[in-house]
C-alpha cells in the first residue's frame, strides 16, 4: 500500500505499472485509466499512486508508445461512511458524535452513474476521448456536515460532526477504535484535500452523458437513506 510514504513504484502504483507494461508488451495502442477525483497535485495520500500512474502514462504518450484517456472517477456516494469517521456500522452505529479531521464540499457520485458513463466512454466511436483527462462527478456538492444532517434524519437521532486536528483524529481512531496507525495517518491526509476544495468538481462530462441518456445523477441523500434503511 501507500502507507509509510512508499517510494515511487513501491506503492499501489507498482501493480498499475505491471498492468501497463503487460498491455504494451501485448501490443495495446490505447489505455483508458480510471484515476480518482482529487486534484493533481493533491494533499491526499490516497491520490499518490494515481498521480504517479497518470504521469507515467503521459510520459508514454509523449514518447509515442501509446495513446491514453484518463478518467478521474468521482468519490462514490457509497463511500461516505469512510469519510464520515469510518461509520461502517451504519444502522448499528451508536455514536452520537463523529470525529473527522476536516470538512469540505464533495461532488459525491453514485457507482451506477459512473459505471454507466464509463461504459459509454469505452464504447464511443474511435478517437473521441483520446488524449483527454476529465472527471466523472456530478456538480452538486455535499459537506460532511450535510452528511451528519442526513444521517440524523435517516436514523431519527441527532448525530453531531466534530472537526478536530489530524493528530487528535489519528490518536482517537488508533487508541479508541483499535485501528492501525499507518492506515489512519495515511487516510487523514484526505481531510486536508477536502478542506482545500479538491473534491468539489466543476466538470460537466458525467451529467452531459447521463442527460443524453435521459438520466439524472443519483443524489447522495437517496444513497444515505437506502444504506441506513
Residue ranges and their predicted role:
Residues 3-11, 26, 37-160, 176:
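Oxidoreductase cofactor-interface core, primarily capturing Rossmann-like NAD(P)-dependent enzymes
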Residues 12, 16, 201:
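Aromatic/hydrophobic pocket-lining residues that form the small-molecule binding cavity
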Residues 17-20, 111-119, 217-225:
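Short, amphipathic alpha-helical "lid/cap" segments that border enzyme active or binding sites
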Residues 29-30:
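Short acidic/polar active-site loop segments enriched in Thr and Asp
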Residues 134, 148-198:
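Terminal hydrophobic/aromatic helix or amphipathic segment near a protein terminus
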Residues 207-229:
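Amphipathic terminal alpha-helices
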